[in-house]
Amino acid sequence: LPAFTLPGPVARLGARLQRVYSNRYVPMIRPDGTPADSISDAALRDSLEDWLLPYLGKVSRLSHFASLDLSAMLAALLPWPLPQRLDELAPKSLSVPSGSRIAIDYSEQPPVLAVRLQELFGLAETPRIAGGRQSVLLHLLSPARRPVQVTQDLASFWANTYAEVKKDLKGRYPKHYWPDDPLIAEPTARAKPRR
């Protein structure tokens, strides 16, 4: 099946599983107490008939494969209640103070949340996943989505580094909102907050 590739969705789901259902957080166990199998490219390719066949009813040409929701199909392979726990402990995305939902990259350790700096105004602490046991690594981005700072301690960034970063960003992006106190400022996904 050359047109049907597994790596993208498999890698993303596998990374989320690895980050959460490791010994550090929650063991990956079936409800009956037996260990759950891992999902790998090889195992999925070897068992295509078992898990893919039920979804092929409306596929009549190769281009239809692109419309299949591999993430949902792979999540359905997990024993209950692992899919629900996975969404609780390792969400695909987090809501930030601006109201945006930002995808989490689980291919890195710790997982990375790349977000524009202005969208975090008003947030005092680094967002956490895995039931509060794991801080995400924040890649703070400029309005042009270029990295300006990497931190796992947002409180320290606001207290110690923000003023310096603000000077640089204010010079490069003068039309954007750069408050003196980011903890009481209104978060925004725009150049300036709405009035």
Predicted regions and their residues:
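Amphipathic alpha-helical packing elements
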Residues: 86-117
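Short, surface-exposed, low-complexity cationic segments
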Residues: 107-136, 140
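Acidic, serine/threonine- and proline-rich low-complexity intrinsically disordered segments
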Residues: 1-93, 133-195
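Short conserved micro-motifs at the rims of enzyme active sites and ligand-binding pockets
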Residues: 106-107, 125-126, 147-153
